Amino acid sequence: MPVKAASGAPSRGRLLLALFPATLTALLALAACRSDHRTPVVLYSPHGRDLLSLLEHTYEKAHPNIDVRWLDMGSQEVYDRVRSEKANPQADVWFGGPDTIFFRGAREDLLEACRPTWAAAIPPEAREPRGLYYGAYRTPAVIVYNSGAIPPAEAPKDWDDLLDPRWKGKIIIRYPLASGTMRAIFGLILSRSIEKTGSTAEGFAWLRRLDAQTRSYEMNASVLVQRIARREGLVTVWDLPDVLLETKHSRELGWVLPSSGTPVIDDAIGLVKGAKHPAEARAFIEWVGSVEAQRLAADRAYRLPARTDIPAGDLPAWARDVEQRLVPAKLDWERLEREGSAWMATWDREVRGKGNR
């Protein structure tokens, strides 16, 4: 069987930046020439247009001297770009992605210490001891299905249900090499294999069975859930905020919190080392973690706050419901950080497109 091709074209902006490494610098310089003398704060983020636009407009309204600019890409792509630009950083704020990726960034000296006033409200396990990054949101992974084609009672309820023969050819998966969310989900499967047998072999066998069920691997995260809504596939796995945002546009989306537990990603934020606008970047980070901005993100962009000092009664109904039903999976995040890249290389070499062999 030929290897499955990752479907979906990157956006025009992403394609230009991928093809021409100097494009970002040129675009920022051009924008500066046309600016109204505001100070730019450049964000690299996987958080998507809805949240980024919301924060951009809200922050700029309160700080008219600031021009918030952002580049939306996968969390692994953010890391790769910040790393490649280390000698001449173009971003000011690294905003979003699992803290396992931020750990790598800290180890490679890509981040600079920043100590916002809300740091103590973040659990110790979700903040770097030296102040290099902090959790901003808690992001659970969910099973997503087309509720127009699948009655809720018949939808997959847990990870193993994805291997049921009735879903063969009906699953679309986000291309995991570019996605921190998918690395966490695949990492959960492999970690459980190690815990049970002492080896990843059973976990990779599970992933091969999932590959046999998979219709395609989607490169573009922004259209993954849309494809399920359009019935190009019927089932996927992805992060809850993106799914809830898409339900504003489609009534044919349902989601399930896996009954055995799901990865809950500490979506972090940090100051890029060598940022061109460090003071403005620190001020933006301070605002993102403020009670005001955390509530705004929960109300308008379906983000669970990382802060532990916000009363449940101050959160929207959807967040209270998720917190009550959520079963966080026990996942060895340190092992995932150490071995995740090797696991993904093995998946790409030995699993992708080989499930039916």
What is each residue range found by the language model?
Residues V142-A149, L190-R192, D266-P278, L296-A297:
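A bilobed periplasmic-binding-protein/Venus flytrap-type ligand-binding module shared by bacterial periplasmic
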Residues T100-R104, A229-R230, L234-E252, A301:
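A ligand-binding cleft/hinge motif common to bilobed small-molecule-binding domains
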Residues R38-G48, I66-L71, K170-I171:
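Short, well-ordered beta-strand elements
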Residues L54-R69:
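Short alpha-helix C-terminal cap/hinge motif
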Residues A329-R357:
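Conserved C-terminal helix/tail region of periplasmic/extracytoplasmic solute-binding proteins
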